[in-house]
């Protein structure tokens, strides 16, 4: 029944999704304003969702242009559906323009198809189809739309300062059948705060180093600019050998007498950096072989001592595991250095329930002082957990099982979704077990089958929660 309903809307779903995907809704602080708190792109995407909601007869409510909601239904209780329309930067290497959606016979290719514009449109159409059916709503629905999920969650922080907390809810921003627990998440900087004079003339001086754009992405590109006093040919040959030995792609060029070294890695979501290749850490590994100036030497040595080849916090003394929620993970997402202001490592750390986060961070901060580094801690989001046997979770899972015959149990993840904003919130789709996960990677796509099946599952789930008693 539900799949047949969705079939009647397939062309509309694709057309509305294409319009949303065409908006480059990447956070841009340089262009932020009161009217566009995280930049014009995210604001434009939020307005786009309001426009299609108004077209279809829904009421909307805007919250300072950084978040808002689409309203449906009636009743005392509220089902929250928490979506986001901001995306991570496209990065390089796409086979098509990431903000000019390509629709093939079986897929749609663009940044945001999986994370989270495709699932957002799927959830929206589930609500729209039920509204078109004139169902007898028993709950209100607030489809809450954020514009800063990929960075600091300013959107939901602002939203829940003044707006009603849903009774229960889900975020269509992960996998089916249901994510009932999420690790704690924090970002912090390790800042080099002690600069040392060079007693002897170094053979090499690190002028600048840059790798990574986001804390929650494994960097796929790194560049170092090095002043080489002598033996430049030897350095280039050693670098080429290093690339070969580590199965890496990279390049070396000379720019106005400065040696420019680049390494290409593999970008993946920061919740599991072990499946990516951190270009920045590899390039620092090579730089450790050079007799650098003292500041750079300390910076590079710190990386190798604490960060390189340590995706689970081993070298930081933070290795920890639980059977329910898994391991601590550490992603070094941003690395910067220049010879005037020294260096910085930007880290995204995720941890399961039971990990003594504050104690571990205090110990680590004290330990690294001797190497000239300090911790600057950002926002901390504690772990989030809902019992998988809760009737709400079971209704979602039943809708999934009815349509897929897949009996996989709900599980927990290292990722962080808007679900953790809710007292009773889970993540629900829209990835299936056979979906290729290219979130935060080049050539991100969603298959039409996945898009329509997710819409159908959301349709049944919302009907079960908000129409049936």
Curated annotation (Swiss-Prot):
Pfam families: M20_dimer, Peptidase_M20
CC cofactor: Zn(2+)
Residue sites binding Zn(2+) 1 per the record: 115, 150, 440
The keyword Isomerase is annotated on this UniProt entry: no
Record-listed Zn(2+) 2 binding positions: 84, 115, 173
Active-site residue list: 86, 149 (proton acceptor)
Cofactor annotation remark: Binds 2 Zn(2+) ions per subunit.
Keyword Zinc (UniProt): yes
Record keywords, A-Z: Dipeptidase, Hydrolase, Metal-binding, Metalloprotease, Protease, Zinc
Domain of life: Bacteria
Gene3D superfamilies: 3.30.70.360, Zn peptidases
E.C. numbers: 3.4.13.-
Molecular function as annotated in GO: acetylornithine deacetylase activity; dipeptidase activity; metallopeptidase activity; zinc ion binding
Any one GO biological process: L-arginine biosynthetic process
Family (UniProt): Belongs to the peptidase M20A family.
Protein name (database record): Putative dipeptidase SAR1836
Organism from which the protein derives: Staphylococcus aureus (strain MRSA252)
């Amino acid at each position: 029944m539900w799949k047949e309903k969705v079939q009647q809307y397939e062309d509309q779903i694709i057309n509305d999704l294409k319009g949303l995907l065409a908006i480059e809704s990447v956070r841009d602080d340089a262009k932020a304003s009161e009217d566009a708190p995280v930049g014009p792109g995210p604001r434009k995407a939020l307005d786009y969702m309001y426009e299609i909601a108004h077209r279809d007869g829904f009421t909307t409510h805007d919250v300072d242009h950084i978040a808002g909601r689409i309203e449906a239904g009636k009743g005392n209780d509220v089902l929250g559906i928490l979506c986001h329309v901001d995306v991570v930067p496209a990065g390089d290497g796409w086979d098509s323009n990431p903000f000019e959606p390509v629709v093939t016979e079986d897929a749609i290719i663009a940044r945001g198809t999986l994370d989270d514009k495709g699932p957002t449109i799927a959830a929206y159409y589930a609500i729209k189809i039920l509204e078109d059916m004139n169902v007898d709503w028993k709950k209100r629905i607030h489809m809450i739309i954020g514009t800063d999920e990929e960075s600091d969650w300013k959107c939901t922080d602002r939203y829940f300062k003044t707006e009603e907390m849903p009774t229960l809810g889900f975020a269509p921003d992960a996998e089916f059948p249901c994510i009932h627990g999420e690790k704690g998440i924090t970002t912090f900087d390790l800042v080099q705060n002690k600069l040392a004079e060079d007693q002897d003339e170094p053979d090499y001086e690190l002028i600048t180093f840059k790798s990574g754009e986001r804390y929650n992405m494994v960097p796929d590109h790194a560049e170092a600019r090095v002043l080489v006093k002598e033996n430049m040919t030897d350095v280039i040959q050693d670098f080429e050998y290093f690339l070969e030995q580590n199965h890496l792609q990279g390049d070396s060029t000379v720019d106005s007498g400065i040696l420019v070294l680049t390494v290409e890695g593999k970008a993946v979501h920061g919740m599991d950096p072990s499946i990516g290749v951190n270009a920045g850490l590899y390039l620092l590994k090579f730089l450790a072989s050079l007799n650098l100036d003292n500041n750079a030497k300390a910076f590079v040595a710190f990386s190798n001592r604490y960060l390189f080849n340590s995706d689970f916090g081993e070298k930081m003394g933070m290795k920890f595991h639980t059977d329910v929620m898994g391991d601590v993970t550490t992603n070094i997402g941003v690395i910067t250095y220049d010879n005037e202001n020294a260096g910085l490592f930007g880290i995204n750390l995720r941890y399961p329930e039971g990990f003594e986060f504050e104690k571990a961070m205090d110990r680590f901060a004290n330990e690294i002082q001797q190497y000239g580094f300090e911790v600057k801690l950002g926002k901390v989001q504690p772990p989030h957990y809902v019992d998988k046997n809760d009737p709400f979770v079971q209704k979602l899972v039943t809708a999934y099982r009815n349509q897929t015959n897949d009996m996989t149990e709900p599980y927990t993840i290292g990722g962080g979704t808007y679900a953790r904003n809710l007292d009773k919130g889970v993540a629900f789709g829209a990835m299936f077990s056979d979906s290729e996960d290219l979130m935060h990677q080049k050539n991100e796509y969603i298959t039409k089958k996945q898009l329509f099946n997710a819409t159908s599952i959301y349709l049944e789930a919302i009907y079960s929660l908000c129409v049936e008693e």
